[in-house]
Each structure stands twice: as C-alpha cells, then as structure tokens.
Design a protein with these regions (language model features):
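Bacterial N-terminal signal peptides
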Residues: 8-16
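Solvent-exposed loop/turn segments at secondary-structure junctions
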Residues: 76, 86-87, 97-98, 229-234, ...
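Loop/turn elements at helix/coil->beta-strand transitions in domains of secreted/extracellular proteins
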Residues: 221, 257-263, 330-338, 345, ...
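Von Willebrand factor
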Residues: 217-341, 346, 380, 384-387
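Acidic, polar low-complexity linker/tail segments
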Residues: 166-224, 230-238, 250-253
Length: 650
C-alpha cells in the first residue's frame, strides 16, 4: 500500500511538472475562434520575469512597436509573447497599445506629393484643412519643417530630401481612424524605425541625414525594354536599336558609361497555339552598360518581328514582364525600370493559352516588391480600335504605383511616327536618369515637376520621366543614407496629400497593408485553393454542393462544417480566416453566397476563378520573398510577419 501511494505521488508530481512546462495559447479576441489578442510595445518597454518592475528583466532590448500576443492579464501588467507558442515575459500595460486588426501603413512614392507631416492632434490637422488659405499655409508649413522651425502642433515629418529607406522594415500601425471629410481619412498612427533606438539590440547607428542628399556612390540605373516582337512591330525594334546606340554614345561622352545599363526582353504569344512563333518570351540580353555595348548591340541586330500571326489580337505581354522581373540581374542596379512597348492588350484571364497566372494588379505588386517601376507604352493603331479600352485599363493597372499610372499611349496610323514617339519616351527616361546620376553626386536634387496638362506626346513623356526620376532619386537617397522612418509614438496624418486636397485632387500619402503571419498566409492560400477547386468542380459537373465542398475542405476554420449554406456568405460561414473580418475593404469573395455563384454565367464563373488564381500566385511569391519577412525576434516561422497590401486580399 505504501509503495502504491509513493508511485501515485510520483505520477502526480510528474503530471504537474509536465503541465507546468506546457505552454498555454494566447488569449482569444472576444467572439473569435482563431484570432488572438495582440498589443504593440512602446519605446522604453521591457519584459520582466514577473508582473513587477522589481523582478528580473528578461528582454531589455525589446524592439519598439513589436507586435505581442497576450497570454494573461494582471493588475496593470500583461503576460506576452512574440509568438503563439509561448509567453516571453510581463510588460507594463500602459506601455502597450491594443492592436487586434494588425493594420499598418506604407509611405507611397513621392513622385507627386509633399512629405507627410505628423500632427500632434486632430485639431491642428483640422485647422489646416478648414483654412480658407489652406494652400498658402501648407507652403509655409513645409518651409518651416525644412528649416526645423515648426510649432508644437507638428511632432515629425517624413524626410524632406529622400524617401524612407525601402530596405529597412518599419512599422506604422493604425491606432485610430476618423473620416471628417468624404473620401479623406485622419489616421492616428505610431511610427518608429526600430534600428534607430539607442541601446536597442537592433540599433544600427546614426545612419545618413536626410538634409544632406550627397552620397559618395553614384546611383546605377537599369532600364529593361520589354518589346512586343509580333507582326507589325519591326519599326519599334529598329528604333530601339538606334535609341540604345545613341544613348550609349552620349553616356560614354559624358563619362557615365557604367551608370546606365540596358536589357532587352522580347515576347510574342503561345507557341502551343502557333508553334511557328518560336517563343512566348525570351531574354535577348541581360543588362549591359556602354562599356560592353557590342554584346547587346550584336544581339539586338538579330531580333526580328514574327513571321506568322498569333492566335489572338492580344499578346502575352505579362509573360514578357514576368520574365524581365525574374530573369534579369536587377541586384546590380539602384533604380530599376521596365519599359513595356506593345500595340495590343495582355492575354485576358479566360484565354487558355495565357502562360502567367498573375493578372496586371498582382504583377504590379510583384514588380513593386522587387523595387521595379513599370512604364507602359501602349501604341494605339486603327487595327486595334476595339481593343484600346481593354488594353489601356490593363496597362494603367500594370504600371500603377500608389495611385499613379506610368502609362503613355501613342495614337498613330503610321508605324514610323509611332516609333518616333516611343523613342521620345525612352530618350526622356534615359536623360532623366543621367540627370539623377549627375545631380546626386553633386549633392543636388531634381525638381518635382508641376502638375500641368501636356500639349503633345513628347511633353507627356518628358513629364512622366521627370516624375519618375524625382521619385527614384528620393528612393536611392533613402537607401544610400539608410534614412529612417520618423520616430513618433502617437500622431495624426491624412491618408491623402494635403497640397492636392487643397486643389480638390486626391493623391495618396500612404498605402494600407495588413500584417499577416506566415501561418495566416498559408491558411489563406489553402482556403483560396479550396474555393478554386470546388468552383472548378461544380462548374464542370453542374453539381449544387459548391459551398458544402468548401466547408468540408475548410473544416478547421469554418464556424460549423454542417451549417446550412443557403443565404450565407463565405464570410458568415467562416471559410476565410477571421483575420479578414472587419478590414476596411470590400471583398468579392467574402460577400459571395452560393446563390450568387449559381447565378453567374460560365464566363463570369471562369473570370472569378482566374482572379483567385492570380491572388494565389501572388501569395506564393510572398512566401518566397525572404527579404521582406520580419521575425520580431521569434524563431517560429509561423509567427513571422509580412505587410500585405489590402488590394492583394481576396
């Protein structure tokens, strides 16, 4: 009996020890099944072993604005962890801010806007917006910011003479949102570059100053011409040869031979449909500078337009763009431009010969992730009149960056005239990038072009090049000087540029993104995959269990796999992750009911499926993008985070 008692006691102790070592999951958000409570840490916050500042500090260098999961709530303290597998320590509750929706901001490019000013409160911001002389006050305020002579109403500003370094992760969480005017939001945000906090384990030194744009290293620009080489494009091919030769001559004369490189990628259409086309897309030459020009010039001399027509008027231009993004040696260049030249739209999503899953919006986001700007030159000929509207919309979307399209249309019935206009665009780009090199090494800035209606295609091309050059110089200086984001604990900004608002125009200051963990992105990928599989199955078989099939495949996330589906949206059924609930965007997928699906025509169903396939392809690229995943000090890959733009959600 005594031995049995000892055995039972030992067993009980072992069980208690095991239980004490088993980590609890974070607290769930109210009303949620899978979403955990989160906060973000403030500067100076530390993690303690116990809920007392007299206990041992277990993390002195806690990165400011680190997202933390809440495991336990005490009196004025929170037990938190960087991941979902264990708690790391206790933090003072007043040194955190609740952040359950995980919305963050990214600065938009500066090609058309002023630096963002961070205001102390909404009253200061509203005073500016309500002022009858708003434009004049903004000019005075920007001058005061530049001279660092602002009043207490301004707490910080985006750097004046460079962009924030795009290669440095910064977090700008949205803490509160108001909409005092239709179409314009006031956002309460925090903003800190964690690498700039003295004493932090992430501290990386002072970095460059935004007020001095001079750098020791001149920027290098890579321009990739992505050329349609189907029937009728020979004049443009020949013009590109002459253009590159002329630019190389000038670069060598001005001692800039190593600072601008050209690459050439050709595209046609499906060789499965028409084998005589020879290729869908091919890299004619990787980047070559003027010093090695013979290599590119000899290869360009071999390029000819196709001898046969393709299976459709639209061509596989997205295959050419994707090939350029993935295959060229961009890493050697600071500024990166794709110059797309075509007289047809991209293959639509319902064309079975399309070789790339991503659609224009997803391709634009993919290029942006790689730091590449796309300039689309769309040649509008009489033969393609019925295609012009579709192609223009597609290429505006493809070349869109933060609300501004780098799109140039050329209306012409004469190929030689069209080729001349194309040369004007490319020449303007090259000259502007040469200016960027020269002025940057002299410590001078390009002037941001004024908003003025162009009088002709050449003037339009020059303005486009100037806007692009201005933005690229700011981006380069941001990287070269390692310019940090403003260090602000709490402040107010507008989502639109104030100077343009004063003129009744809308130019975005910021882009909204949601911080997704790798686990959430994997779930989203699986859920979208299940929707696609069941959509294709029911489309082929005419079966009527579309939603039930999705529920069966998504049993882990669905609120109830046996729930009646009639009249319910996918969001109400809980098929998609709860992290999408309440986000400020309108989701075509989340609002879909089973009745909606069966009311769609075959063509509409196919288009819906293809849009989801495009998102799926983009998520796979996010997963591959190791550079932009942020760990926040957790070793669990499932808890790493990525800033996914709202328009990339399904």
């Amino acid at each position: 009996m005594h031995r049995l008692t000892v055995f039972l006691l030992c067993l009980l102790c072992g069980t208690l020890i095991l239980a004490s070592n088993t980590e609890a999951a974070p607290l769930l958000q109210e009303g949620k099944r899978t979403l955990y409570q989160r906060v973000i840490s403030h500067p100076t916050a530390q993690l303690y072993a116990q809920a007392s500042d007299q206990s041992q500090v277990v993390d002195k260098g806690l990165r400011p604005f680190t997202p933390l999961y809440v495991y336990e709530r005490g009196q004025g303290w929170l037990n938190v962890g960087k991941g979902t597998n264990k708690a790391d320590g206790w933090i003072k509750a007043d040194l955190t801010t609740p952040w359950n929706q995980s919305l963050t901001l990214l600065f938009s490019n500066r090609s058309q806007r002023d630096p963002v000013i961070f205001f102390r409160d909404t009253r200061a911001l509203q005073d500016i917006c309500d002022a009858p002389d708003m434009s004049e006050r903004l000019v005075s305020l920007q001058l005061a910011v530049a001279k660092k002579k602002t009043g207490p109403e301004v707490v910080a500003s985006e750097p004046m003479t460079s962009s924030v370094d795009l290669d440095r992760f910064y977090l700008m969480p949205i803490l509160e949102m108001q909409e005092p005017y239709e179409g314009t939001k006031f956002l309460r945000v925090a903003s800190i570059d964690p690498g700039q906090i003295p004493g932090s384990q992430y501290h990386q030194g002072k970095g460059g100053t935004a007020s001095d744009p001079t750098t020791k290293k001149a920027p290098r620009t890579g321009i990739a011409i992505v050329m349609d080489t189907t029937v009728s494009m020979q004049p443009y091919i020949e013009q590109s040869r002459q253009l590159i030769k002329t630019i190389y001559d000038r670069l060598q004369k001005e001692k800039l031979a190593e600072h601008v490189g050209f690459a050439f990628v050709a595209f046609r259409n499906s060789t499965a449909a028409v084998p005589e086309l020879e290729y869908v897309s091919t890299v004619v030459s990787d980047f070559v500078t003027a010093s090695n020009r013979k290599e590119l010039e000899s290869r360009l001399a071999e390029v000819r337009e196709a001898k046969v027509s393709t299976h459709s008027f639209n061509e596989d231009s997205l295959a050419g763009v994707y090939n350029a993004i993935e295959s060229l040696s961009w890493d050697e260049y600071d500024s990166r431009i794709i110059l797309l030249v075509t007289d047809a739209g991209p293959l639509p999503s319902d064309d079975r010969y399309r070789s790339v899953a991503m659609e224009p919006q997803e391709m634009a986001d993919f290029a942006g992730q790689k730091g590449i700007w796309i300039v689309a030159v769309h040649i509008k000929t009489p033969a393609g009149a019925s295609n012009h509207d579709y192609a223009e919309q597609a290429y505006r979307t493809l070349s869109m960056k933060n609300g501004s399209a780098q799109y140039q249309s050329i209306k012409t019935s004469n190929p030689k005239e069209g080729a001349r206009y194309f040369a004007a665009v490319a020449e303007s780009l090259a000259k502007t990038m040469e200016q960027v090199v020269t002025l940057t090494t002299q410590g001078k800035m390009l002037t941001r072009p004024k908003d003025a209606a162009p009088k002709n295609p050449e003037e339009d091309a020059a303005q486009l090049a100037q806007r692009l050059g201005y933005a690229l110089q700011l981006e380069y200086l941001g990287r070269a000087n390692r310019t940090p984001a403003p260090q602000v604990v709490s402040s107010w900004i507008t989502d639109m540029d104030l100077a343009h608002l004063a003129r009744g125009q809308r130019v975005p200051n910021v882009e909204v993104a949601v911080l997704l963990t790798k686990a959430q992105l994997n779930d989203l990928h699986a859920q979208i995959g299940a929707i696609i599989d069941n959509a294709e199955r029911t489309k082929k078989t005419d079966s009527t269990d579309f939603f039930q099939g999705i529920l069966s495949a998504s049993a882990r996330t669905a609120r109830d796999p046996n729930m009646p589906t009639q009249g319910k949206t996918l969001a109400e059924l809980g098929v998609l992750g709860e992290f999408l609930d309440g986000l400020p965007y309108r989701s075509e997928v989340m609002l879909l009911t089973e009745e909606d699906w069966y009311r769609k025509s075959i063509g509409e169903q196919t288009a819906f499926i293809n849009r989801l396939k495009s998102k799926l392809a983009r998520y796979e690229e996010y997963d591959r993008d190791r550079k932009n995943w942020e760990t926040f000090g957790t070793f669990s890959a499932n808890d790493w985070v990525y800033r996914v733009p709202l328009n990339m959600l399904p």
